Structure formats: structure tokens, C-alpha cells
């Protein structure tokens, strides 16, 4: 697929894709994923062509931007590493997120509270989100999916080839997709300027690491408060000593 020069993959984005290990695919390859294989490493891992990945990101973004109401796009991730990315994507683009377990019947059973009638569905993993893809096929909803080389592609209309098992890879794909959608909608008109949002915001964070970081910040803050208290005490002590010396000198003069 040839893209206009405006949509060319920049060196910065290529470095991001490689740093996030988006190019590391599975050892097994589905027949529909063979065009996305760049080469096979000696250890058996297949390398994904990141140029193809970028082309599919642009294609998916153009499809998403063509939908007038952003809420008609549903972003789904039952995989833990993709839930934070889905929520951030929805917050930035206005899509409807489903992070966690997908309730069966959400697209087919209008009696359920979670019933939705989206115009487009985006999933993180065709295997873990198989129920959402199956229901989308029943009601003719197009599906965009982040697919690894061994992922099933039945009922997937647009497959974005990537490493959909790594937390950095998943977060970066959702980040680039959100940025491209905002650019096509005109929210980010200047393509030469970087987006103010960093990719790290889309990465999965372990709750234990967050608690540890919070505890360290509190410890540092308490340490600073202790140092300030010590400094204040020393200043008060020095002031008291000066006052005593001055009083003693006055008594000697008298």
C-alpha cells in the first residue's frame, strides 16, 4: 500500500517501534500474516516489517477518523497489558472503552445493560477478545485488531501486525493510533510538531510498582520536611545564642 509522503514513517517513529520491540513476532506464522514477515532470526523468532505496521496504523486511523461520532468506536482489551492503553486512547479520542472482561451479548443482546451498537470495533488481541470479534461478525461491525504473526484473522477486517504480547508494544501501537486519529481530525494540525502526550502514558504499570514509587516519594517528602525542621531549629538556636551574648555584653557594660 503506497501512502502520500505526508504519511511516511519518520525516523523517530521507527526508533520508537524498534525500542518497544514491536517488530518481534511469534515463531509460528499464520498464512494470512506471511506478507508482514521481514525475516526469521536464527533463534526462530520472526521479525515483523515495521513499515507494514505503520501502513496499517495509518489505514486504521483513516477509517476511525471517517466516523462522525467518536463514541461509535469501541476500543476493547481484555488483556491486562492493553487495558491502560485502551482507557487512555478513549480519553484522547472520545471512543468508548471496554477494559477487562467483555460481557457476552454486549453487541447482540439488547436486553443487557452493557448493550452497544458501535460502528467500529478495535481489539488488542484476536484470541483474548474472540467473543467481541464473533459478536461483531453477527451484526456486521468492522473490526480492527492488533495481530501477531500467529494470531487468527477470521472476521478481522484490518490487521495491524505487531507484537501484541509486550506491554510496551501494545501501549505504543495504541499511542500511535490515537495520535494519527487526532492528526486526521485536525486536532493536531502540524505534523512536524511532536505530540505533547508521551508514549509512556499508554504503557501498563504494575500496581506494586506504583505503590513503591508513591512510598518513595512520600519518604523523600518527609525527609525534606525533616531537614527543613532541623534547619529551622538550628536558626532558632543561633538566634537565642546571639540574644544571650548580646544580653551578657549589656550587663558587662552596665
UniProtKB/Swiss-Prot annotation:
The modified positions for N-acetylserine read 2
Looking at the record, which segments are called Disordered? 212-254
| One cellular-component annotation, GO | cytosolic small ribosomal subunit
The lineage's top-level taxon is: Eukaryota
Write out the GO MF terms.
structural constituent of ribosome
Per the UniProt entry, the disulfide pairs are none
From the UniProt record, give one GO term of the biological process aspect: ribosomal small subunit assembly
**Protein purpose:** Required for the assembly and/or stability of the 40S ribosomal subunit. Required for the processing of the 20S rRNA-precursor to mature 18S rRNA in a late step of the maturation of 40S ribosomal subunits.
Q: How does it assemble?
A: Component of the small ribosomal subunit. Mature ribosomes consist of a small (40S) and a large (60S) subunit. The 40S subunit contains about 33 different proteins and 1 molecule of RNA (18S). The 60S subunit contains about 49 different proteins and 3 molecules of RNA (25S, 5.8S and 5S). Interacts with RPS21.
Q: Which family does it belong to?
A: Belongs to the universal ribosomal protein uS2 family.
This chain's protein is named Small ribosomal subunit protein uS2
| Organism listed in the record | Kluyveromyces lactis (strain ATCC 8585 / CBS 2359 / DSM 70799 / NBRC 1267 / NRRL Y-1140 / WM37)
Amino acid at each position: 500500500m503506497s501512502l502520500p509522503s505526508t504519511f511516511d514513517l519518520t525516523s523517530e517513529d521507527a526508533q520508537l517501534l524498534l525500542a518497544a520491540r514491536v517488530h518481534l513476532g511469534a515463531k509460528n506464522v499464520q498464512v494470512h500474516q506471511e506478507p508482514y514477515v521481514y525475516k526469521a532470526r536464527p533463534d526462530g523468532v520472526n521479525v515483523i516489517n515495521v513499515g507494514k505496521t505503520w501502513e496499517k496504523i495509518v489505514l486504521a486511523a483513516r477509517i476511525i477518523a471517517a466516523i462522525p461520532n467518536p463514541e461509535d468506536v469501541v476500543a476493547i482489551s481484555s488483556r491486562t497489558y492493553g487495558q491502560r492503553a485502551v482507557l487512555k486512547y478513549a480519553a484522547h479520542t472520545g471512543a468508548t472503552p471496554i477494559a477487562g472482561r467483555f460481557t457476552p451479548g454486549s453487541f447482540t443482546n439488547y436486553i443487557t445493560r452493557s448493550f452497544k451498537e458501535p460502528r467500529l470495533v478495535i481489539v488488542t488481541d484476536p484470541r483474548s477478545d474472540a467473543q467481541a470479534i464473533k459478536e461483531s461478525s453477527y451484526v456486521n461491525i468492522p473490526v480492527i485488531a492488533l495481530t501477531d504473526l500467529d494470531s487468527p484473522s477470521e472476521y478481522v477486517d484490518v490487521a495491524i501486525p505487531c507484537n501484541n504480547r509486550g506491554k510496551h508494544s501494545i501501549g505504543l501501537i495504541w499511542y500511535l493510533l490515537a495520535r494519527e486519529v487526532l492528526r486526521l481530525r485536525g486536532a493536531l494540525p502540524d505534523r512536524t510538531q511532536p505530540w505533547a502526550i508521551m508514549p509512556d502514558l499508554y504503557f501498563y504499570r504494575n500496581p506494586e510498582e506504583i505503590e513503591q514509587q508513591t512510598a518513595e516519594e512520600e519518604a523523600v517528602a518527609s525527609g525534606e520536611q525533616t531537614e527543613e525542621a532541623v534547619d529551622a531549629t538550628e536558626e532558632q538556636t543561633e538566634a537565642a545564642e546571639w540574644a544571650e551574648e548580646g544580653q551578657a555584653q549589656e550587663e558587662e557594660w552596665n
